[in-house]
């Protein structure tokens, strides 16, 4: 049931400060997502230049995910004991340093180490962003906020990836990481100067040791349900996306120089669709939107992973529809899952959830690397099998999200939890 304050806020929409916070967090998410996503299109360049196999490339993706997962678990016991602004700034600074290392290294081994360092800090950042979002916005507005935050993913495709690919074509694969460092530095300075302290949760924190707080969080049954769902949600992106650029170039016949156009149009569709999906999820129900996204995702994955040499226009259409389906799932799922934890456990829950996603994604990337193999021409084999795995996890998460939706709606997303 809504309180009078909540009803008033829903009628008024976002305050000026809330709009600014959403904008800042979106830019921050943009740098984190771009740092992770940029490896996928660079795969077609990195593998031959560094002389590595798809399995080794999968390890580059996985080491980031595993280190992010480890840091999130280690941080889970104490993240609720600090002002979220300070926590954000400390880990964002470490993320910038790690990304700078990626821009300076020249060998596979050092790049592997740099990705591990970057992941250590990025692992806590994602959960902190969502904890801040949950602290500052009521559940009834959260779909809208998640829809806007999701545009960071799309903006990475529209602006970040084409620009990163252009820089890599001109100055080498290190250049995109230096671009991310430049943008992230500006975002960090803005957050330091203008973001207000976010410490209301400190008034709710129970007097537990970090270990006790961690054990309490991982022992709650409804939290475990959320963790399991988050793990499967992450599997799809990690098992398919890291190998998409190589699949586009070597299987579908798309020239490497045309990849920026594919990501540009696909991302533009996601930018338009993201906020609309968020509004619709708040209006008609988040689980209904999740169902729609799951159906679209399954359909497009089955089409995409079975394509042969394909005209550029059709590739862009299939990719765009696939991203709309994925966005629908992630926006609605993020809003639903954010309502699971109590306010006093929010940072810890989000940190563990993020860690579970990262570890699950890392395992999925390794699995994808083991399933996919290259022919002597560079074409990928068994990519359809990867698609079948993704379809299977999508169906399972659909069932799991149904029960989460019933639990969240049954609790009414009370202020204590939402």
Predicted regions and their residues:
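Juxtamembrane intracellular "pre-TM" segments in multi-pass secondary transporters
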Residues: 5-15, 196-227
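C-terminal transmembrane helical hairpin of 12-TM major facilitator-type secondary transporters
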Residues: 287-333
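Cytoplasmic helix-loop-helix junction between adjacent transmembrane helices
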Residues: 114-154
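Helix-loop-helix hairpin linking two adjacent transmembrane segments in secondary transporters
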Residues: 148-195
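Extracytoplasmic gate region of multi-pass secondary transporters
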Residues: 39-40, 223-264
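Helix-breaking motifs and short loop linkers at transmembrane-helix boundaries and internal kinks
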Residues: 51, 83, 104-110, 253, ...
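Conserved MFS/SLC helix-loop-helix module at the cytosolic interface between two early adjacent transmembrane helices
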Residues: 70-106
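A membrane-interface helix-boundary motif in multi-pass transporters
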Residues: 169-181, 372-392
